[in-house]
Amino acid sequence: MKRIFLFLATNIAVLVVINIVLAVLGINSRGGAGSLLAYSAVVGFTGSIISLLMSKFIAKQSVGAEVIDTPRTEEEAWLLNTVEAQARQWNLKTPEVAIYHSPEPNAFATGASRNSSLIAVSTGLLDHMTRDEVEAVLAHEMAHVGNGDMVTLTLIQGVVNTFVVFLSRIIANLIARNNDGSQSQGTYFLVSMVFQILFGFLASLIVMWFSRQREYRADAGAAKLVGAPKMISALQRLKGNPVDLPEEMNAMGIAGDTRDSLLSTHPSLDNRIARLKSL
């Protein structure tokens, strides 16, 4: 739960900071509904797009991922060959492949586009899983890349952020208006920030729901690529190994929660396994 609230707080904080910067620069949302919507879109999409463009850099820095340029071991060579073969099946440029040091079994995919991506696995994943299970995890992450989930998630976050800013400003305009038609600037800013935080939390439920659906879709993509039994075996292995990632990377990891929640980025492992068994 702590990870989820930090994720929500980060997104809301980005919106607040952008609003403050625009206010300091003298760029405001005054005008008609069309101008306000355009302003809201700028605020709503800026943070999401910047995060997407910097996603590989942020991912590498946050977990200390080391990209495999030239394989030094048989295991690294196998990882590169497996990812390359899966990328060919998706008709994609081979993603960068990286390993990061962590005892917890996990993996994630990120990148600005389908042909500019990164797949990283933890040393814990390589230590705890069989080759078949690691292959399934790689296929799951490749499905995220092939489905364009990183870009889609960014667009959805940008859209909901836009309406969060738009609706909070509409309400602030109404509340801050004085009887003589003038407007209290301090009240307007304070009210808009309060409602931005409130609507930001509610809008995040939509993003979380989409994230859970993309996990089911990536599981199905992995099953199609390597077979459902391998993917089921990998998820069952994760049930016995609690995992963790930095907050900003949590939505991109393979592991999920042990139970379902509206604030979860992943469905429960039991539900994912049940969905795979029904394919």
Swiss-Prot record:
Its cofactor is Zn(2+). Pfam families: Peptidase_M48. CDD domains: M48B_HtpX_like. Its EC number is 3.4.24.-. It is found in: Cell inner membrane. It is a multi-pass membrane protein. The keyword Cell inner membrane applies. GO terms for molecular function: metalloendopeptidase activity; zinc ion binding. The chain crosses the membrane at residues 4-24, 34-54, 155-175, 189-209. This is Protease HtpX homolog. It comes from Neisseria gonorrhoeae (strain ATCC 700825 / FA 1090).
